[in-house]
C-alpha cells in the first residue's frame, strides 16, 4: 500500500510537460550515492488561500499553549483528566530520562518546543502542525505555527534577541474568527497580534525515485533524526540556517517561516522513494521562490515541475490529511477522529488545560472512538456530481453496497402501545423500520481524491479481507462509487486494538 501511495503521488507529476533538468554539484546529503538518484524530482507551486497572524511578546508561548492542542511548554504535567500541576523538574529530564531543552520562554526568539521524539523533547525553528478547538472539543481549524523569521543571522540577530515571535497559518476566511478569539483570550498576557498580509505561501516536495522501496529514505537520517538532538536555541538556529540557506541562499532572509511535513514520517520510514513535503512562507516580493532553489545542494540531477494548489491538495487528500478550515465545516469534528493523535506533536495527552481539552482528554483516556478519517477515491465522478457535492451544505453519507443475495431483512422496531387507544396517525402496533447507519461521511474532495470519516467497525471488511466491502454515495440522481484507501497510520492503529 505504501509503495502504491508513493507511486500515485509521483504519477500525478508526470502530467506536466514543463520538466527542467537541474545538474547538482556540492553535496548537502552526503550519505546518498548519486548513482542511485538519476531521477530526483522537485515539484513546487504557490498556495494562494493562506493568511497569517503574527503573535509576539514575552507571554506569547504561554498564551498559545492555552489555545492549541500541541504541547508548547514543558512546565506542566497532567495528573488526571481534571487537574494539572507544575513540574518540579522542568527543563531537566523528560519522562524517558532524556535531556530536556534549555530555553527562556519569555526572552529571545528561541524557536518552538517539540514535546516528543525518540530522543526526547527538542527545540526547532521549523513550524509544527497543530489545531485550535472550541470549548466543546470540536475542531475550529488546523494551523501551522512557525517560529519567525525562518533564518537567524547577522541581519536578523537584533530582532531575534527580543522575545518569541510566531506566524500562525490559517485559511483566509477564518482569520476574523481567530482574531476575535485571540482578543477574548488575551486578558493580561503581554503579547501583540495582528494579521500579516504581505506574504506568499509555497508548497514543494523533493523525492528520490531512483531509490527502491527497501532503501533507507534519505530524509530520515539527514533531517528527522538530527532535529531531535537539538536541545538549545543556538543549535536549532544553526541547523535551520544551514538547511534553509543551503536550499534557498538568495532568498533566505525573505523566508518568514519554514515547515517540514512530519505527518508522513511513518511512510518515509517504510519507503525509500517517498517524497518529503515542505511549506515556506516568504515576503510578497518573491516572484518565484524556486527560481532561487539551490540545485547544488544535492549530488544528483533533478526534474523540476511547477504545479497548482489543486495538485498539492490532492496529494494531501491521498494521505488522508486536512489542510485548512476550508476543507471542513468548523465545530463539527473531533481532533482524534482526524487522526491528529498519530501526527508528531500535534495533540498532547499530558500538557494540562487548553481550550477543548476535556473531551479530547476523555476520548484519549477511554479509547472510545467510533470514527476515523481515511483517504478515498471516486470511481465514476461526473461533472454534475462534482457540482452537486460542492453545493452540498452538509457532509454526504457514504453507504455500504449490499449484495441482494446476501441481504438480510431490515429489523423492525415496535412502537409502545398508546394508552389512548387507536391513533389517527396509525395503529399502536405499527412496526417501524430502523434506519441503517451510514458507513461514513464525505468530508472533502478534489477531483477523484477525497477524505471521509468512516465508522471503525467497517475497517476489518475494508482492509483485512481479500474481498473488501464496496461503498457508494448518492447525490441527486448520481450514484458515485467510493473506494477506501489504506491510511498511513492503519498498521499502528490495528496493533493497538
Swiss-Prot record:
One Gene Ontology cellular component: mitochondrial matrix
Pfam families given in the database record: Beta-barrel_CAF17_C
Ranges of compositional bias, category Polar residues: 412-428
SUPFAM superfamilies in UniProt: Folate-binding domain (SSF103025)
Disordered: annotated span: 88-107, 404-428
Chief site of localization: mitochondrion
InterPro entries from the UniProt entry: YgfZ/GcvT, YgfZ/GcvT_CS
Entry coiled-coil feature ranges: none
Keywords: Mitochondrion, Transit peptide
GO molecular function list: transferase activity
The organelle targeting sequence, given as a residue range: 1-36
Location within or outside the cell: Mitochondrion matrix
Biological process annotations from GO: iron-sulfur cluster assembly; protein maturation
Family membership noted in the UniProt record: Belongs to the GcvT family. CAF17/IBA57 subfamily.
PANTHER family: TRANSFERASE CAF17, MITOCHONDRIAL-RELATED
Entry protein name: Iron-sulfur cluster assembly factor IBA57 homolog, mitochondrial
Gene name in the database record: CAF17
Amino acid at each position: 500500500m505504501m509503495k502504491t501511495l508513493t507511486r500515485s503521488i509521483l504519477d500525478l507529476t508526470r502530467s506536466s510537460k514543463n520538466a527542467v533538468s537541474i545538474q547538482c554539484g556540492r553535496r548537502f546529503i552526503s550519505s546518498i550515492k548519486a548513482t542511485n538518484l538519476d531521477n530526483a524530482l522537485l515539484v513546487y507551486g504557490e498556495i494562494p488561500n493562506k493568511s497569517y497572524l503574527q503573535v509576539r511578546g514575552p507571554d506569547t508561548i504561554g498564551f498559545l499553549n492555552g489555545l492549541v492542542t500541541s504541547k508548547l511548554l514543558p512546565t506542566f504535567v497532567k495528573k488526571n483528566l481534571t487537574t494539572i500541576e507544575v513540574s518540579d523538574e522542568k527543563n531537566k529530564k523528560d519522562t524517558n530520562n532524556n535531556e530536556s531543552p534549555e530555553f527562556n520562554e519569555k526572552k529571545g526568539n528561541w524557536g518552538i518546543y517539540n514535546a516528543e521524539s525518540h530522543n526526547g523533547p527538542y527545540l526547532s525553528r521549523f513550524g509544527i502542525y497543530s489545531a485550535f478547538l472550541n470549548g466543546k472539543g470540536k475542531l475550529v481549524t488546523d494551523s501551522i505555527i512557525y517560529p519567525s523569521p525562518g533564518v537567524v543571522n547577522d541581519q536578523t540577530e537584533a530582532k531575534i534577541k527580543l522575545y518569541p515571535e510566531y506566524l500562525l497559518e490559517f485559511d483566509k476566511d477564518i482569520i476574523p474568527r481567530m482574531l476575535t478569539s485571540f482578543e477574548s483570550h488575551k486578558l493580561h498576557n503581554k503579547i501583540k497580534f495582528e494579521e500579516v498580509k504581505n506574504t506568499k505561501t509555497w508548497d514543494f516536495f523533493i523525492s528520490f525515485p531512483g531509490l527502491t522501496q527497501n532503501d533507507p529514505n534519505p530524509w530520515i537520517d539527514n533531517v528527522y533524526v538530527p532535529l531531535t538532538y537539538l536541545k538549545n536555541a543556538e543549535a536549532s538556529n544553526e541547523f535551520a540556517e544551514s538547511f534553509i540557506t543551503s536550499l534557498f541562499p538568495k532568498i533566505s532572509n525573505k523566508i518568514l517561516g519554514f515547515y517540514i511535513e512530519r505527518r508522513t514520517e511513518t511512510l518515509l520510514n517504510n519507503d525509500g522513494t517517498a517524497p518529503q513535503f515542505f511549506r515556506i512562507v516568504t515576503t510578497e516580493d518573491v516572484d518565484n521562490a524556486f527560481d532561487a532553489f539551490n540545485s547544488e545542494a544535492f549530488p544528483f540531477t533533478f526534474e523540476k515541475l511547477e504545479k497548482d494548489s489543486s495538485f498539492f491538495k490532492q496529494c494531501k487528500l491521498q494521505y488522508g490529511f486536512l489542510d485548512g478550515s476550508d476543507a471542513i465545516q468548523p465545530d463539527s469534528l473531533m481532533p482524534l477522529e482526524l487522526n491528529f493523535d498519530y501526527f508528531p506533536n500535534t495533540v498532547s495527552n499530558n500538557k494540562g488545560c487548553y481550550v477543548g481539552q476535556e473531551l479530547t482528554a476523555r476520548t484519549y483516556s477511554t479509547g472510545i472512538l467510533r470514527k476515523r478519517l481515511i483517504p478515498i477515491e471516486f470511481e465514476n465522478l461526473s461533472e454534475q456530481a462534482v457540482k452537486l457535492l460542492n453545493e452540498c451544505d452538509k457532509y454526504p453519507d457514504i453507504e455500504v453496497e449490499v449484495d441482494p443475495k446476501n441481504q438480510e431483512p431490515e429489523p423492525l422496531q415496535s412502537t409502545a402501545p398508546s394508552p389512548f387507544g387507536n391513533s389517527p396517525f396509525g395503529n399502536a402496533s405499527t412496526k417501524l423500520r430502523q434506519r441503517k447507519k451510514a458507513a461514513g461521511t464525505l468530508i472533502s474532495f478534489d477531483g477523484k481524491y477525497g477524505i471521509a470519516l468512516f465508522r471503525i467497525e467497517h475497517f476489518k471488511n475494508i482492509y483485512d479481507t481479500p474481498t473488501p466491502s464496496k461503498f457508494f454515495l448518492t447525490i441527486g440522481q448520481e450514484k458515485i462509487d467510493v473506494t477506501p484507501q489504506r491510511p498511513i497510520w492503519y498498521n499502528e492503529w490495528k496493533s493497538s486494538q
